[in-house]
């Protein structure tokens, strides 16, 4: 009986892990509520914005397999839970 229970627990965990897909916010505005389902292998949500004083902040949000590299005058934030890139 214990073996059957353990087998069911392992199968459940494997099935849940295989079926999980990350969701991230994806829009160019400061306040965002558009949700995007990431592709298989994309395990990171990110938000990038630059600090140009005259033009204001320009936001880029999305999914990635790794955290994007920061460019000069750019801030990059990465996280790995659903809709964490607000």
Swiss-Prot record:
The keyword Ribosomal protein does not apply. Residues 1-21 form the signal peptide. CDD domains: TFP_snake_toxin. Belongs to the three-finger toxin family. Ancestral subfamily. Orphan group II sub-subfamily. One of its GO terms (molecular function) is acetylcholine receptor inhibitor activity. Binds with low affinity and weakly inhibits muscle nicotinic acetylcholine receptor (nAChR). One of its GO terms (cellular component) is extracellular region. Disulfide bonds join 24-45, 27-32, 38-63, 67-78, 79-84. Its main location: secreted. Keywords: Acetylcholine receptor inhibiting toxin, Disulfide bond, Ion channel impairing toxin, Neurotoxin, Postsynaptic neurotoxin, Secreted, Signal, Toxin. This is Long neurotoxin homolog. It comes from Naja atra. Expressed by the venom gland. It is found in: Secreted.
């Amino acid at each position: 009986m214990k073996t059957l229970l353990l087998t069911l627990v392992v199968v459940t965990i494997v099935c849940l892990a295989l079926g999980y897909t990350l969701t991230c916010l994806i829009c160019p505005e400061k306040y965002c509520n558009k949700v995007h389902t990431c592709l298989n292998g994309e395990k990171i949500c990110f938000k990038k914005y630059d600090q140009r004083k005259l033009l204001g902040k320009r936001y880029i949000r999305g999914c990635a397999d790794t955290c994007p590299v920061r460019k000069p005058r750019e801030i990059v934030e990465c996280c790995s839970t659903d809709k964490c890139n607000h």
